[in-house]
Amino acid sequence: MAEEAYEYLVPLEKYLSAGVRLGTRLSNRYLEERGFIFAVRPDGLRIFDIKKIDERLKIAAKFIARYPPDRVLVHTTRPYGFKPVQMFCKFVGCRALTGRFIPGTLTNPNLPHYQEVDLLFVVDPKLDAQAVTEAAKMGIPVVALVDTDTPHQYIDLMVPCNNKGRKSLALIFWILARQILRERGELKPDQDLPVPPEEFETRLVQ
């Protein structure tokens, strides 16, 4: 009996054109051992397994959809992540925190910027280390986009992908927003968001 063809969330070509599978020249053994890293190019660049990325996006969408959206904080300090995070939160209803993460945001209720949340979602655990550390102290689960060189400590659910590229981040957050809304029954299984992935993309200033 022939193996059933795997069904991707978006056509394979979309993943490839957005550079979602492109990693760095450094590699985290933890990710290698779990089969996330598919190959190494002659120039040393690590390449993610697109099927693994797609599978993790499905898992992450189911996981995030279980939480009340207003109890989910999505954070990034990476400028290319600002627009994708803001658009994601607009559609899904989560809280967006872009830019600097002020120490104590998750741990000190006496601060005016304190936020009490049930789930933290970060774009890059290396850049967003303060948020990840505070979430760990408070017992808050952490979902993270991880590149090939990303440390895995304190991350409860990893989504391997290019978490640095403008087009990659736009597509990843577009897919997640759509899939979460489908999981919540707010979109039909074959229904798309009313805007294309390009609307999630940070514009370059000339």
From Swiss-Prot:
InterPro entries: Ribosomal_uS2, Ribosomal_uS2_arc, Ribosomal_uS2_euk/arc, Ribosomal_uS2_flav_dom_sf. It comes from Pyrobaculum neutrophilum (strain DSM 2338 / JCM 9278 / NBRC 100436 / V24Sta) (Thermoproteus neutrophilus). Belongs to the universal ribosomal protein uS2 family. Keywords: Ribonucleoprotein, Ribosomal protein. The keyword Ribosomal protein applies. Disulfide bonds: none annotated. This is Small ribosomal subunit protein uS2. Gene3D superfamilies: Glucose-6-phosphate isomerase like protein, domain 1. One of its GO terms (cellular component) is small ribosomal subunit. HAMAP family: Ribosomal_uS2_A. Pfam families: Ribosomal_S2 (PF00318). GO terms for biological process: translation. One of its GO terms (molecular function) is structural constituent of ribosome.
